[in-house]
């Protein structure tokens, strides 16, 4: 018996699910069309698949306790992927879960937009629609497979601009195998006005390099989700679900907004910025976007932001490139050399009257996020003004 967290009295959303004994609560809920977030695919690592087990379910496991406060444990919160169905159960799930749907989608595009990043676009089935707030993420089912990068990745979809780097680093010598079906979460780069589709920016997760002076990759498998996505071609079918997450803009505030991104962390930030400008036509808030990349050929959606900058005087786009880039100079693209956290500080925040009054929205690689966090902390920005996304970087 499943009900929303706002109370068991809300009968209108109660649902009975019959399931065989022995499986996980996560699997049982999925079989009943209730899709809890599960970024790690049910491995007990992400702590996302939370539900309140009001009756049944037994004692909480040691593997779950680290994800909950003592009060939450007392209130019967569990990780659905760790909780086995051994008897009749009464379960409460977060209200928004009832808005999540799963579809078989068709791939409509899967091209590289940077050396190691794909723009992956799928169409929802005809007549289907997803209501979501920009900054949400989707989940993709990863089936069992065995693949060879050289045979199974379409080189024409990587493109001539990026192929030399793939060959130089030996990526086409990699192989990947997935022995059990899994799920992965990726932030959506699209915003609602772009129609009934899901657009992700996916970075290939290669094995670490061997320590110098050795060359090549360590004998470790590449990422099973990104490897799978990089093999997909237009016309292929994939199972997706969404929307999930709460990395959303605060719409009813008039505070200044700053987005900070790097790498594939572009996705949810693009969605939010496009929605705030193109859809909501926001002109009464100061807005800026600082994006960090190694070089100009690793920057994508640049035209989107330059166009918004022209159309909205309250929006500015700032590009930070790791080092001086002759290609950017030749193209006349404005940028500042340096890491993004330093560029934000030196070119903007150090002379800002009140950095603590800005809302910060951040998504990108771990080291970037940590450096930005430390810089903002040193400026006295309270933690609650920072909004993070975990599924884009």
Predicted regions and their residues:
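Local cysteine-cluster metal-coordination motifs and their immediate loop/turn environment
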Residues: 35-62, 70-87, 362, 366-367
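Short, contiguous acidic and Ser/Thr-rich linear segments
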Residues: 14-23
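Generic structural signal for buried aliphatic residues
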Residues: 25, 138, 238-240
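Short, surface-exposed secondary-structure boundary micro-motifs
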Residues: 51-57, 94-96, 143, 203, ...
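Fe-S ferredoxin-like electron-transfer domains
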Residues: 66-128
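FNR/FR-type flavoprotein reductase catalytic core
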Residues: 206-393
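Ferredoxin-reductase
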Residues: 106-234, 293-294, 320-324
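Single conserved hydrophobic/aromatic residue that forms the stacking wall/gate
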Residues: 1-12
């Amino acid at each position: 018996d499943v009900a929303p967290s706002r109370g068991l009295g809300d009968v209108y959303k109660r649902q009975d699910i019959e399931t065989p004994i022995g499986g996980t609560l996560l699997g049982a809920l999925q079989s009943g069309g209730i899709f809890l977030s599960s970024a790690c695919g049910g491995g007990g690592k992400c702590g996302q698949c939370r539900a309140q087990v009001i009756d049944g379910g037994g004692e909480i496991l040691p593997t779950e306790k680290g994800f909950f406060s003592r009060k939450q444990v007392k209130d019967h919160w569990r990780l659905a992927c760790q909780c086995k169905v051994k008897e009749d159960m009464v379960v409460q799930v977060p209200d928004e879960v009832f808005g999540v749907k799963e579809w078989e989608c068709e791939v409509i595009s899967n091209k590289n937009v940077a050396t190691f990043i794909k723009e992956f676009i799928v169409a929802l089935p005809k007549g289907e629609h997803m209501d979501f707030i920009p900054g949400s993420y989707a989940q993709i089912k990863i089936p069992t497979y065995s693949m060879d990068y050289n045979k199974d990745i379409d080189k024409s979809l990587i493109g001539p601009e990026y192929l030399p780097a793939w060959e130089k680093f030996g990526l086409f010598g990699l192989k990947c195998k997935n022995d059990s079906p899994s799920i992965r979460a990726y932030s959506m780069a699209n915003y609602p006005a772009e129609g009934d589709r899901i657009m992700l920016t996916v970075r290939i997760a290669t094995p670490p390099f061997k320590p110098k002076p050795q060359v090549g990759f360590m004998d470790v498998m590449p990422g099973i989700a990104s490897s799978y996505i990089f093999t997909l071609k237009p016309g292929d079918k994939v199972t997706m679900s969404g929307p999930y997450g709460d990395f959303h803009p605060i719409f009813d505030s008039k505070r200044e907004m700053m987005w900070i991104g790097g790498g594939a962390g572009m996705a949810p930030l693009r969605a939010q910025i496009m929605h705030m400008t193109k859809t909501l036509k926001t002109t009464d808030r100061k807005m800026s976007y600082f994006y960090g990349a190694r070089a100009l050929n690793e920057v994508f959606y640049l035209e989107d932001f330059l166009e918004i900058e022209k159309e909205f005087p309250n929006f500015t786009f700032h590009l930070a490139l790791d080092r001086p880039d002759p290609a950017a100079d030749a193209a006349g693209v404005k940028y500042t050399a340096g890491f993004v956290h330093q560029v934000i500080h030196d070119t903007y925040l150090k002379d800002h009257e009140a950095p603590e009054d800005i809302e910060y929205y951040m998504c990108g690689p771990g080291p970037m996020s940590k450096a930005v966090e430390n810089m903002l902390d040193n400026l006295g920005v309270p933690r609650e003004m920072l909004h993070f996304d975990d599924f884009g970087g």
